[in-house]
Amino acid sequence: MTDNKTVPNGAPILYIVPTPIGNLGDITQRALDVLASVDMIAVEDTRHTGKLLAHFNISTKTFALHDHNEQQKAQVLVDKLLSGLSIALVSDAGTPLISDPGYHLVTQCRQAGVKVVPLPGPCAVITALSASGLPSDSFSFEGFLPAKSKARKDKLLEIAKVSRTCIFYESPHRICESLQDMLDVLGGEREVVLARELTKTFETIQGMPLAELITWIAEDDNRKKGEMVLLVHGYRDAGEQQLPDEALRTLTILTKELPLKKAAALVAEIHQLKKNALYKWGLENLGE
C-alpha cells in the first residue's frame, strides 16, 4: 500500500468505477470514496445510479452518458476534465465499457492527455467464469449474442472450433432461442454453463451438456428469468479422450505424493486411459 488519496490535485483524471451487479455489499470502499469526492459522475441511467448514490448518501451531481448520446457528449466531458473538474464513469451495473458505454469517452480522454484510472471491482464475466468449472487459462468475452437467429448462428460458427472458453451475455426473453441455435451449431454434447442472477438471492450456476441444459431450463420458467451469462466450453477434437472424474480425482490424490509423470502412468494403467492425456491434464490443472 502506498497512497490512498482518492482525488489528487493537479492533472485531470477520469475514474472508471465498477458498481455492484446485484449485491450492494460488493461495492468497494475506494469506489465509494471516489464517487463522493469527484465533481461529477457520468452515468448510464441517472435514475438507476441515483438510487445507488442515495443508498450510500452520496450527493455528487450526475451527467447522463449512454449508448445513444456518448459520441456526441464525450467531448463535453473531456472539456470539463481539461477545465479542472474530476469525473467518475459508472454503468448501471458492473465494470464500465464491458458491454456498456464508455469506450468513446475513454478513447477521447487518452487522446487529450487526460489520465484514466481504472478501479477493480464487480464484473459478471469474471464472476461467472470463476465459478463455472470451465477452463479459465484461455477465454474470450464475446458480448451479447445477436438478436436475430441468422446473425446468432453466424457468430456461433465463428467460435465453434476455437479451443478457448467463450463467454456471452444473453437476455431472458431470448435465452431459449439462443440455446437452440447453439444446439444446432455446436451440438448437444458441448458443455455450457448458465450463470443467472449473480450475487442476488436466486443466483444459479448450472453447467451440463447443452442438450441437457435446454431440458433443465424448460422444466422451470424461473430458470429463464434474470440477468444471464452463458459460458461455452472450447472445442475438443472428437478423437481427444474424455477423462472420467474418478480418474482425475485419483490423479489429484496421487500427485500429492508422487511426481506427475509417475502418477499419470499409474492412473492410466488403473483406468485404461492414455498416459499423455492424463499428464497434459495434470500440467494444466495441477502444475508439475
Curated annotation (Swiss-Prot):
UniProt organism field: Vibrio cholerae serotype O1 (strain ATCC 39315 / El Tor Inaba N16961)
Residue stretches in coiled coil: none
Primary site of residence: cytoplasm
GO cellular component: cytoplasm
CDD domains the UniProt entry points to: RsmI
Keyword Methyltransferase belongs to the record: yes
Record-level Gene Ontology MF annotations: rRNA (cytosine-2'-O-)-methyltransferase activity
One of the Pfam families matching this protein, by short name: TP_methylase
Official protein name in the record: Ribosomal RNA small subunit methyltransferase I
Swiss-Prot/TrEMBL catalytic activity: cytidine(1402) in 16S rRNA + S-adenosyl-L-methionine = 2'-O-methylcytidine(1402) in 16S rRNA + S-adenosyl-L-homocysteine + H(+)
Annotated keywords: Cytoplasm, Methyltransferase, rRNA processing, S-adenosyl-L-methionine, Transferase
Gene3D superfamilies reported for this sequence: Cobalt-precorrin-4 Transmethylase, Domain 1 (3.40.1010.10), Methyltransferase, Cobalt-precorrin-4 Transmethylase, Domain 2 (3.30.950.10)
Enzyme class label: transferase
Location in or out of the cell: Cytoplasm
NCBIfam families in alphabetical order: 16S rRNA (cytidine(1402)-2'-O)-methyltransferase
Family, similarity comment: Belongs to the methyltransferase superfamily. RsmI family.
EC number: 2.1.1.198
InterPro entries the UniProt entry points to: 4pyrrol_Mease (IPR000878), 4pyrrol_Methylase_sf (IPR035996), 4pyrrole_Mease_sub1 (IPR014777), 4pyrrole_Mease_sub2 (IPR014776), rRNA_ssu_MeTfrase_I (IPR008189), RsmI_HTH (IPR053910), SAM_MeTrfase_RsmI_CS (IPR018063)
